[in-house]
Amino acid sequence: TIFGTFNKGIKDTNRIAIIGGIATEFGISSKIPSGFDGIPVLNPLQATFYGFKDDRKTDDIDNLWSLFEAALALADNDTEEKRQEFSDAYDKVHDQYCIRWNITMGLYWIRPYTFINLDSRNRWFIADVHNMPAEFVVAVEKKLKNAPYAADYLEIRDLCKKALDTNEYEYKNF
């Protein structure tokens, strides 16, 4: 949700200003980006990953934090144990209010070389045999109809990474 405050359909100058405010507030000294090409954006009217107080359950925000931690752990060390922890957290968040494909954007934002964003543009792109191998498209096509649960999400990610690792495409990562 923090990333959603600036990764939404607003002008780049506003995105930069929001990031600058966050950096100042939290004492972050990293360079503020000046361009956002290729970064998926949320609908500005749905830029949070949780509902307002009356629309969310008491553990919704804690569940998001658990997924964040599990995603970082999986990105750092991809083991069966870490995959299970990630899957448990992801599946718990999957059915929460305000969660759909946007959860894949959030994962991409925190570790873009590990997690694939499945927004509508990427789904269209990877489901086209002109962009990805035919066997990949056949394997994932049905999994792209609805926001996937963890097992399907990880399978899509793994198959996509495998296809990109063949070096048959000019693009090499998510």
What is each stretch, according to the model?
Residues 103-110:
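Short hydrophobic alpha-helical segments that form membrane-spanning helices or hydrophobic packing faces
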